[in-house]
């Protein structure tokens, strides 16, 4: 059942191979979306709230225990893994989870850090993961974090960003300082925008963009700035940030070659996703 989605390639991969064995029912307010990217089995044109209210009148409560068990089996069979001995994006997110005991509100920007935040923080409550999904809105997360902290002063609020995304809206740290909104800004800093760096390598004589000193930047705006280059340094930095009661920027220096797994190659189907082990076995 597809509700208000447009079947973009970020969701379907190769649209011709998407959910070939499924019956697809699409609900959308715009008739032009029907059968546009994926052929559907049935379509319902209407306001989603009205349609879902009508559907709920006819549906019985479902027991999803069997499906939840199956998902758990998949997680055990295909666990998320990463290199445990160095500071990395997955480690940073898992450590945030450990120190906040899963009770924080997490916001993200767009990119690798966004995927790691979704994969390695165990969300158990609604409205605790604020992200723009596949919309690609770099700069969204810090503003979302300020709003969340203003509305829920009792919660630890962390914006997880990459160095590129943070630069899109980093001036809002000054807003946090001015209004004393104690958000924790974690920058997973791999020093690159992957696609931009590729163009710089191929077409601009390897003249790469410079990386900003985020610690000095935070201090210039009146916030605490902390740099972490090891796991122990990040543990200490985040513990300090939680106890400080004022805006903090933690600059986490990670390897530029760290990748998110699994992934789907351009033009491939979702069923053709691969990970690092698959590459090594080729």
Where are these regions (language model features)?
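Glycine/aspartate-rich loop-and-adjacent alpha/beta segment that forms the canonical ThDP
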Residues: 10-11, 239-282
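A short alpha/beta connector and helix-capping loop motif
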Residues: 40-52, 171-188, 263-265
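Short beta-alpha connecting loops at secondary-structure transitions
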Residues: 34-42, 127-131, 168, 196-207, ...
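Active-site diphosphate/adenylate-binding microenvironment
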Residues: 72-149
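Conserved thiamine diphosphate
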Residues: 51, 200-239
